[in-house]
């Protein structure tokens, strides 16, 4: 029994509850991608094949759902970096991850206005945590590619790669910005090769 006044130990969520949560996040990401952050939460629940009560049990507000979609996308990108580091040659892992970063930006650009409208402190913490994950992931993959001798380390800061791709995304108001960002990935990778 925990000492008096200490928080009760948290239990791991049931497998079905976690599965529902992940289905809700994926359904919300897809709904926000097609209809913006104002998409119907009833449609999100329906697409996840759960009731609206289940959605609200996991995410009591629209903002909570938006924040968790954002957090989840950043966490998935971080996890992909580690998986790619273990499964692909360094330069291929870096390129694949940067292309996944473009997909992440697609979600982020949809959520950015809603994130700005959130309580400033919450939004800042969310962005800081996600930024730390992305920095760690980029550093891991760039470090492997440099260590393998496939790319040059001359003045390279892994964040510069993310900034270059993000710059294309932010500057590109055109509907094909993601294709331009994917081309930028190849330009960057080719420019870094030894």
Where are these regions (language model features)?
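C-terminal peripheral helix-coil segments that are non-catalytic and often amphipathic
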Residues: 1-8, 135-148, 171-194
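All-alpha amphipathic helical-bundle segments outside canonical DNA-binding/catalytic cores
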Residues: 128-130, 146-163, 174-180
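Basic, helix-initiating cap at the start of DNA-binding domains
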Residues: 1-47, 64-67
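Short hydrophobic/aromatic patch on the recognition helix
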Residues: 49-59
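Amphipathic alpha-helical segments used for helix-helix packing
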Residues: 93-123, 160-163
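Alpha-helical DNA-contacting segments of helix-turn-helix folds
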Residues: 66-73, 108
């Amino acid at each position: 029994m925990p000492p008096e006044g200490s928080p009760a130990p948290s239990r791991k969520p049931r497998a079905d509850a976690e599965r529902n949560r992940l289905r809700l996040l994926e359904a919300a990401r897809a709904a926000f991608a097609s209809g913006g952050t104002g998409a119907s939460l009833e449609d999100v629940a329906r697409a996840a094949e759960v009731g609206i009560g289940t959605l609200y049990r996991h995410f009591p507000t629209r903002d909570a759902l938006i924040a968790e979609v954002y957090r989840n996308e950043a966490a998935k990108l971080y996890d992909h970096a580690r998986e790619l580091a273990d499964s692909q040659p360094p330069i291929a892992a870096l390129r694949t991850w940067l292309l996944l970063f473009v997909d992440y930006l697609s979600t982020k650009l949809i959520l950015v206005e809603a994130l700005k409208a959130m309580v400033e402190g919450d939004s800042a913490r969310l962005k800081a945590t996600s930024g730390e994950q992305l920095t760690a992931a980029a550093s891991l993959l760039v470090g492997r590619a440099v260590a393998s001798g496939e790319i040059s380390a001359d003045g390279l800061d892994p964040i510069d790669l993310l900034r270059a791709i993000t710059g294309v995304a932010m500057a590109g108001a055109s509907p094909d910005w993601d294709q331009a960002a994917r081309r930028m990935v190849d330009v960057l990778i080719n420019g870094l090769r030894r």
